[in-house]
Amino acid sequence: SEGEITMSLLGAMETSLPGLEYLKFMDEELLLMLPKGHPLSYDYTKCLPGRPYPVMDLADLGDTPILGSAPETSYGNMVLSIYRNAGLEPNIIFRSNVVPLLYEMVLNGVGAAMIPDSYYNPDDGICVYSLSPRIIVYQGIGLRSGYPLSEAEEYLIHLVMNNWGSPYYMHQYADYYLEQRKLRIDAYEYNQI
């Protein structure tokens, strides 16, 4: 319908979302990021590429200021619960749904934050830790179920899947997915399903 959202770039903790088709194109770990010079920092240059990050117990953060995800983010309430269980809720000094802002605040020494791995740049000098168990979040495109896509929306799907962290095989999957989706919508419209 006119004025309704039909498609969105969407981070999520799960891929089965009511009323949506979710086209997942990337998994990434949610990492604890510490500012430069934090007492729990380590020499990040010694971390080997492709190897797991060190693991930290959040309770070790003590009185470290925490930058939290806003509740409207896909993982905001879960992150708040994790901080709460570690006794760190009183340390939360700021919340935002703008992840690059949280990263910049860590970079500028304001506090620690849980941020998706794709934002991390080792050259920035901040330290990252995994949690145990690891927390995986998904990046993808949410489409309103049964809604026929415009050419512009199809183009955006191709653009995102070909350029935003997707493994190479996902580049070809975009064509297949869109073709199969059209067949499902056509079959539904003609009561074949």
What is the predicted function of each stretch?
Residues 127-180:
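A late-sequence structural motif
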Residues 1-4, 11, 72-127, 186-192:
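Hydrophobic hinge/microswitch elements
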Residues 34, 42-86, 150-153, 164-177:
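Secondary-structure junction motif
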Residues 68-69, 95, 142:
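Active-site-adjacent beta-strand anchor residues
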Residues 7-13, 35, 69-70:
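Short beta-strand elements of ligand-binding domains
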Residues 2-4, 27, 63:
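Alpha-helix C-terminal capping/helix-to-coil transition sites in glycosyltransferase folds
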